[in-house]
Design a protein with these regions (language model features):
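Glycine-rich phosphate/pyrophosphate-binding loops
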Residues: 113-135
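Short beta-strand segments
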Residues: 6, 32-34, 64, 88-91, ...
Length: 267
């Protein structure tokens, strides 16, 4: 059993270390992670410069690229055979709702899914001290279920864990992605030279109320498990947009005629 572990917080992140150690009881663990923090790297791929790989230990590699780069290098080059399972995390901070669109943690799991590897993103609530041991225990439990039962096609698991001791967590809930609102997400400042610069930041002020919302599970002390599908097509809206297929195209005869060379007139 071969397990690939990666993240977006970097190779030296405590969450990565704790997760890899916990998974060593399940199978042979390979760690391939960015050489520095790559938070909010989303699904970026490095195309215009070479990637450097440094081996830091037995089956432990640091990559000078994004989380998605790490997954590609690991699955397609570094590992002797593709892994049976991929886990990305444990991320410092939750990846709930809209966060998944920006998260390098979740994107690494998405890339694993694209490459045909059953994958799970693991994130933990908090900002200072983290109960990564509790997060790792839940991650291992879900990982065993994935290995036993598999995942639906093109589907990954987004696991978020409240920052509590293991015995204080109230269980696991299957949830949906929620929506959030921010207050003043762009901060404008002036540097000592009088030039304007910006921080993309802001304070989350509310979550949308929806059935089985992921953030509500975390607020109530439960682990949030959200299945995410790669196909983001809004299938329910296809019929509505099909009427746009009747938008008039240029008259074929007129287009053909305009492309024909004009005959020379006799003088």
């Amino acid at each position: 059993m071969r397990i690939l572990v990666t993240n977006d917080d970097g190779i030296h992140s405590p969450g990565l270390t704790v997760l890899a150690k916990a998974l060593s009881r399940v199978g042979e663990v390979w760690v391939v992670a960015p050489d520095r923090e790559r938070t909010a790297a989303a699904h970026a791929v490095t195309l215009h410069k070479p990637l450097r790989v440094q081996q830091l230990g037995t089956r432990v590699y640091a990559v000078s690229g994004t989380p998605v780069d790490c997954v590609n290098l690991a699955v397609l080059k570094l590992l002797p055979t593709p892994p049976d399972l991929l886990l990305s995390g444990i991320n410092r901070g939750v990846n709930l709702g809209d966060d998944v669109l920006y998260s390098g943690t979740v994107s690494a799991a998405m890339e694993g899914t694209i490459l045909g590897v059953p994958s799970m993103a693991v994130s933990q609530e908090g900002q200072g001290q983290f109960h990564f041991d509790a997060g790792a225990r839940y991650a291992v439990r879900i990982a065993r279920l994935i290995l036993k039962e598999g995942l639906p096609d093109e589907t990954l698991v987004n696991l978020n864990i409240p920052n509590r001791p293991f015995r204080s967590i109230t269980g696991v809930r299957v949830t949906c992605l929620s929506r959030r609102r921010f207050d003043n997400p762009i901060i404008e400042k002036i540097d000592p030279h009088g030039r304007t610069y910006y921080w993309i930041a802001g304070t989350r002020i509310s979550w949308s109320r929806s059935k089985d919302a992921d953030y509500e599970a975390i607020e109530q002390g439960a682990v949030s498990l959200t299945p995410i599908h790669l196909d983001t097509t809004h299938h329910g809206a296809l019929d509505r947009f099909r009427k746009w297929e009747t938008v008039r195209r240029p008259n074929a005869r007129r287009v053909t005629a305009s492309l024909k060379p004009k005959s020379k007139q006799r003088s």
